Design a protein with these regions (language model features):
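Residues that define the transmembrane beta-barrel architecture of outer-membrane proteins
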Residues: 81-85, 278-282
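Bacterial N-terminal signal peptides
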Residues: 12-24
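Transmembrane beta-strands of outer-membrane beta-barrel pores
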Residues: 78-82, 93, 268-272, 290-292, ...
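Short segments within alpha-helical structural elements
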Residues: 120-122, 185-209, 347-404
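Amphipathic alpha-helical coiled-coil scaffold segments and their short linker/junction regions
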Residues: 36-45, 105, 172-173, 177-179, ...
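A glycine-/polar-enriched beta->alpha junction
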Residues: 40-50, 57-72, 87-105, 114-122, ...
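Transmembrane beta-strand segments that form the barrel wall of outer-membrane beta-barrel proteins
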Residues: 69-80, 99, 260-271
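Periplasmic alpha-helical coiled-coil/stalk elements that build and connect Gram-negative outer-membrane
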Residues: 121-233, 238, 328-331, 335, ...
Length: 408
């Protein structure tokens, strides 16, 4: 490659480029992965989903606990008074209005946890898409920087040839040397950034992130224009609604728990040494809790505070969800329009750069004009890469904040 046959003055810069390119490409075979494969791996093995999954298990366990009946208590005793042997069974009575309220609290909490987990899965998909898009953008910038470094090397050799032929000055050679060195350093930095972005994709997938093991199979494309918001309640809002319903049910349970559940006691007495009371003597009892010393005020106040908090969080979730969707849709529209204009600008800037280089080879224009034309071409293509990445990120954000429970 011509970009690696450098003059002695530029040997250190070219060595940096060569090392960076080896790091970016990798010395071992890398498995190509598509965007969908990265998303699937993130959902199956990613850290975000793994951290969110236990919450749903805990909520399901809470619902199982709420539905369970209390175990009876068996007791046995001995007394000197007749009858001397006593045995009893205490059976807690789960009142229907307390049981139903308790189960409703746990059921709504489980619904909220399930919806939050669905939102976390959507967030994991969003993170994977964002990481993949960022890696594509960094890889495109690295390729652009490498091409720019090679073009700058060619321009330097052209300036040296024209100087040796008497058609250019030493100033042109020095300007070309500075330009080539700067672009070589930029290529090295962009190559390192591309490797870092690729390792971030591996981390999101749940893979080791110490060395590149994958390659990007997709390319940066303009997202489709059909980013319609699906019908239904967004996942984040639905989870907040379930939390609010659970808090309402918890407050109702606290009010109903002023009278705690009673318990029924059944037992027998036996063994009268005098023989006055032969056989077994049945006993029966009913234990009731009367609110004489407290009316469950602390629990009621705490439940009321949690209800107010849940309602406030629901209001915030609704407002933030609406704002996030609107902002993401605006960002998508702006980035898509900019990408369309960038394509036309890139074509024009490339033509200007090619024409200026040809004119310099013929001695028709000065070297600074060529450098400026190439700089504008680099910036135009760099803006196109950034705007395509921004459009893809905005499309992912629209999907994240508008996903509903029925979204596939």
């Amino acid at each position: 490659m011509s970009g690696l046959r450098c003059p002695a003055a530029r040997a250190p810069a070219c060595l940096v480029v060569a090392v960076a390119l080896c790091g970016a490409g990798g010395l071992t075979a890398q498995q190509p992965v598509t965007r969908e494969q990265v998303v699937a791996a993130a959902l199956a093995h990613g850290p975000r989903v793994a951290l969110a999954a236990p919450d749903t298990s805990a909520a399901r366990a809470g619902l199982i606990t709420a539905r369970e009946l209390q175990n009876p208590t068996v007791s046995a005793s001995y007394s000197k008074d007749v009858p001397q042997y006593h045995a009893s069974v205490e059976l807690p009575l789960d009142l229907p209005w307390l049981r139903s309220a308790r189960i409703r609290v746990a059921a709504e909490a489980r619904s909220s946890a399930r919806l939050r987990f669905a939102f976390e899965r959507a967030g994991a998909r969003f993170d994977a898409e964002q990481a993949y898009t960022a890696a594509l953008a960094e890889a495109a910038h690295a390729r652009l920087s490498r091409r720019n470094a090679l073009d700058a090397d060619s321009l330097l050799r052209m300036a040296v040839l024209r100087r040796d032929a008497g058609d250019a000055s030493e100033l042109d050679v020095q300007l070309s040397t500075v330009n080539a060195g700067q672009l070589a350093n930029q290529a090295a930095g962009d190559s390192a950034d591309a490797v870092s972005a690729l390792l971030e994709v591996q981390r999101v997938m749940g893979l080791a992130a110490d060395r590149p093991a994958i390659a990007l199979a997709d390319t940066l494309e303009t997202p489709g224009a059909d980013a319609a918001v699906p019908a239904g309640v967004p996942l984040r809002v639905a989870a907040a609604e379930a939390s609010a319903r659970s808090a309402d049910a918890a407050l109702a349970l606290a009010h109903r728990s002023v009278f705690a559940s009673p318990s029924l006691t059944l037992g027998i007495d036996s063994h009268d040494p005098t023989g006055a009371e032969p056989g077994l003597l049945p006993t029966f009892g009913l234990a009731l809790t009367f609110p004489l010393l407290n009316f469950n005020g602390g629990a009621i106040a705490a439940a009321a505070a949690q209800r107010d908090l849940a309602r406030a969080e629901l209001d915030v979730a609704r407002r933030e969800s609406e704002a996030a969707v609107a902002q993401a849709r605006r960002d998508l529209a702006v980035a898509t329009a900019k990408a369309v204009r960038d394509r036309a600008l890139v074509a024009s800037a490339d033509r200007v750069a090619a024409m200026s280089l040809a004119a310099y080879a013929e001695g028709a224009v000065a070297l600074p004009s060529v450098l400026e034309a190439q700089r504008q071409a680099r910036e135009a293509l760099g803006h196109l890469i950034d705007d395509l990445a921004a459009a893809s990120a905005a499309a992912s954000a629209v999907r994240l904040f508008s996903d509903t429970e029925t979204t596939p």
